Design a protein with these regions (language model features):
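A generic structural signal for short hydrophobic patches within well-formed alpha-helices
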Residues: 111-112, 124
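Active-site-adjacent beta-strand/loop module that shapes the phosphate/pyrophosphate-binding cleft
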Residues: 61-62, 70-94, 102-108, 120, ...
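Charged phosphate-binding loop/patch that engages nucleotide di/tri-phosphates or the phosphate backbone
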Residues: 119-136
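Conserved N-terminal beta-strand and adjoining loop/helix that marks the start
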Residues: 1-19, 39
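HhH-family (HhH-GPD) DNA N-glycosylase catalytic core used in base-excision repair
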Residues: 55, 61, 130-132
Length: 136
């Protein structure tokens, strides 16, 4: 059996909007949109990894709220797990610091106006269902 490496993604929500991040690197992912996040380090809880990754990538203080049902395979040995998250009071506004060049808050009706990374689409669909919007 192969060990899997968990990648955490944040469905960062604010006033019914979802934060999407446009990749700037690596070149094969640049220009596509994703849920921000990253790899869980050995010995780290996924929720702690999510908080750390959001601070590193977006400069924010956020907290995981609830795990989104599902687990989505990425390039082996990685697997994506997603949590809803929110900004903590007093947090700075998100800004692209690492691996991204643009951020966008998407309302439910605009969720599919950006070209999501294929690997993130199933997770975004699940988040969309939780927001009460039509899946695509």
């Amino acid at each position: 059996m192969t060990d899997r490496t968990v990648v955490v993604g944040a469905a960062l929500l604010d006033a019914g909007r979802l934060l999407a991040a446009r990749r700037s690197a690596p070149p094969e992912l640049a220009g596509r949109w994703e849920l921000p996040g990253g790899k869980v380090e050995p010995g780290e809880r996924p929720e702690d990894a999510l908080t750390r990754e959001l601070a590193e990538e977006l400069g924010i203080d956020a907290e995981p709220v609830e795990r989104v049902p599902g687990e989505w395979p990425l390039k082996s040995p990685y697997v994506l797990r997603v949590w809803t998250a929110r900004l903590r009071p007093g947090s700075a506004a998100p800004r692209p610091l690492q691996d991204h060049d643009e951020l966008r808050w998407l309302t439910p009706e605009r969720l599919w106006e950006v070209p999501w990374l294929e690997q993130d689409v199933p997770a975004v669909r699940e988040v969309a269902a939780r927001l009460g919007t039509g899946a695509r």
